[in-house]
Amino acid sequence: MKKDFHSTYYIIVVEDLESHHVIGTATLFLERKFLRGKGICGHIEEVIVHPDHQRKAIGKLMVLTLIKLAFSLNSYKVILDCSDSNVGFYEKCGLSRAGIEMKKYASHSII
């Protein structure tokens, strides 16, 4: 397998400088799409902000930073999955609804 770019994952970690606790994290995963001429699709995942620090624009800053990073690395789009309760937050970050997520979890009997 040939690797066409240096990094696949980019992780943001936000630390409270007073308490030295992690108060937020977010991840960008870059995926090459065969049907898009090996174009890059950015996936934003695991956006988490500690409840004591929510509604302070930390999550929005992380998401906007990852979107900017994805496009600077030539992604043709950025996608993410979220619950219905988080749609408004992501719309404020400039994303819009597109499709329906499907999933199947691995059973616990897997080796």
Swiss-Prot record:
EC number: 2.3.1.4
Gene Ontology cellular component terms for the protein in this record: cytosol; nucleus
Domain of life, per lineage: Eukaryota
Family, similarity comment: Belongs to the acetyltransferase family. GNA1 subfamily.
Gene3D superfamilies found in the cross-reference section: 3.40.630.30
Pathway of action: Nucleotide-sugar biosynthesis; UDP-N-acetyl-alpha-D-glucosamine biosynthesis; N-acetyl-alpha-D-glucosamine 1-phosphate from alpha-D-glucosamine 6-phosphate (route I): step 1/2
Binding-site residues for substrate, renumbered to this chain: K33, F34, L35, R36, E45, E46, V47, Y76, K77, D81
Amino-acid positions noted as binding acetyl-CoA in the UniProt annotation, renumbered to this chain: V47, I48, V49, R55, K56, A57, I58, G59, K60, Y90, E91, K92
The gene coding this protein: gna1
Top-level enzyme category: transferase
Pfam families reported for this sequence: Acetyltransf_1
Keywords: Acyltransferase, Transferase
Domain N-acetyltransferase: 1-111
Reaction(s) the record says it catalyses: D-glucosamine 6-phosphate + acetyl-CoA = N-acetyl-D-glucosamine 6-phosphate + CoA + H(+)
Any single GO BP term: UDP-N-acetylglucosamine biosynthetic process
Lineage: Eukaryota, Fungi, Dikarya, Ascomycota, Taphrinomycotina
Official protein name in the record: Glucosamine 6-phosphate N-acetyltransferase
Keyword Disulfide bond part of the UniProt annotation: no
Record GO terms (molecular function): glucosamine 6-phosphate N-acetyltransferase activity
